[in-house]
């Protein structure tokens, strides 16, 4: 499953759980908060595995079966019969990823249950498929489809890997669109789920580089629109979390949009959201990149140099245009994920059939990003007042 289990608590209580209450000026309800463990497990459609079955499937949780680890515990590769979902005797059949909870780990039973609550009932091409779970004595495990290409993080940042090959421009746009579709689905009626932890390590890629969102341990039911939760214990990942969420605890769907904007910057620049190995002023990607997002000429200075001539300059400018709006300080100024999807669809079309335009010779920025009229802005899901390019 890749390294999708990194620590993500910004302000953690001794219990490790973040208590949510609704803003006094708005009202809503969270169905998940009132569900018991029994109700969640009885309502899911995925399989309940015995611990012995998963022990056999992973070859006794051997160290050479480990494909990832983090706050939750370890993720193991395993194999099941595709028809019966029983363990196979040889390394053949359906490849699975088994996430095993560490009883003394950073994350706990509540997040395990949250994953089952959402992935056990939701189905979408851009969400990782949950195949089953195990609840036996102190054992807590989750069984997923195996994502052969690992995480987006592994394809953007070398992290000491000598055989590293950065993701191509075309695939970066594809991954961005896939992830946006998954997030838009979560925000849509009647799902209304706030994902709360969108980041490169939680976007997994299958053998065809189809991107899917994983790790739903921090997900929450709604609210949508202008309503917001107030979290007394803010959880997420430094560098990705929306500023209003970090500073006030206010959380809604636009908080996810901000985090997605950070991912878009990572795709554009090839830099990590937070990198302590860089000079102090360059460690936070958003803070470093913002001054460059004010004009098309500056944008081209921060594009990942490893891409060489793979991209058209106007494509980079259009991606930056989408990112800068997602990263608006004012949540209401950020586009919805449906709007982001529409804008990325148009960007992908331009990658396949690039426009014959030199961005450095275009005086009208609207023409550069393909937004010639007010109506065109609205169709793309871009706010004319907040376009910074």
Curated annotation (Swiss-Prot):
Catalytic residues (positions): 197 (proton acceptor)
Protein name: Probable serine/threonine-protein kinase PBL1
Alphabetical list of PANTHER family matching this protein: OS01G0588500 PROTEIN-RELATED (PTHR45621)
Taxonomic source organism: Arabidopsis thaliana
One Pfam family it belongs to: PK_Tyr_Ser-Thr
Residue numbers binding ATP: 67-75, 99
GO molecular function, one term: ATP binding
Lipid-attached positions, S-palmitoyl cysteine: 4
Modified residues (Phosphoserine): 201, 231
Residues where Phosphotyrosine is found: 144, 245
